[in-house]
Amino acid sequence: MAYSGKWVPKNISKYRGDPKKITYRSNWEKFFFEWLDKNPEIIAWGSETAVIPYFCNAEGKKRRYFMDIWMKDSSGQEFFIEIKPKKETQPPVKPAHLTTAAKKRFMNEIYTWSVNTDKWKAAQSLAEKRGIKFRILTEDGLRALGFKGA
């Protein structure tokens, strides 16, 4: 079961969107929300406020990508931030032994990788057009910001 819940910012004036409707979908997102809220260098941010249309090749149809975070720092630079496990930011590795379970897991990983890369290409393209920087934040980056959890 995924770790999720509602979250309320202390610095409501920094949040763009409805502060009563903020949902974290992982303990990593919750940590990053708290970091954004406390960090004086972040002047504005929102959770799932940027919606990016993309074509999902795995499903053969148009979809909408709800970016995890939009933020603006004190220099005025805007960022799209996607929070993902490092494992999902790299192409899957074919298992050495192709058991039924390993094949199924590998196929799921290929599907996830395909969907993610389609989303990230669309996000990067839109970001470049708007002068926004697109970043994928993994557990390594979160630890560098002070995350202590698993």
Swiss-Prot record:
Function of the protein: During phage morphogenesis, plays an essential role in the head-tail joining step. The associated nuclease activity is essential for morphogenesis, possibly by cleaving packaged DNA to enable the joining of heads to tails. Displays both exo- and endonuclease activity.
InterPro entries membership: NUCL_HEAD_T4 (IPR046390), TnsA_N (IPR014833)
Indicate the residues that form the catalytic site: 29, 68, 84
- Recite the UniProt keywords alphabetically: Endonuclease, Exonuclease, Hydrolase, Nuclease
Name the Enzyme Commission number(s) assigned to this protein.
Answer: 3.1.-.-
Query: Source organism's superkingdom?
Result: Viruses
Main enzyme class: hydrolase
Give the family this protein belongs to, as stated in its UniProt record: Belongs to the Caudovirales head completion nuclease family.
**Cell cycle: present as a keyword of the record?**
no
Look up and give the organism this protein is from.
Answer: Enterobacteria phage T4 (Bacteriophage T4)
One Gene Ontology term of the molecular function aspect: endonuclease activity
The reply on keyword Magnesium is no
Q: Under which name does UniProt file this protein?
A: Head completion nuclease
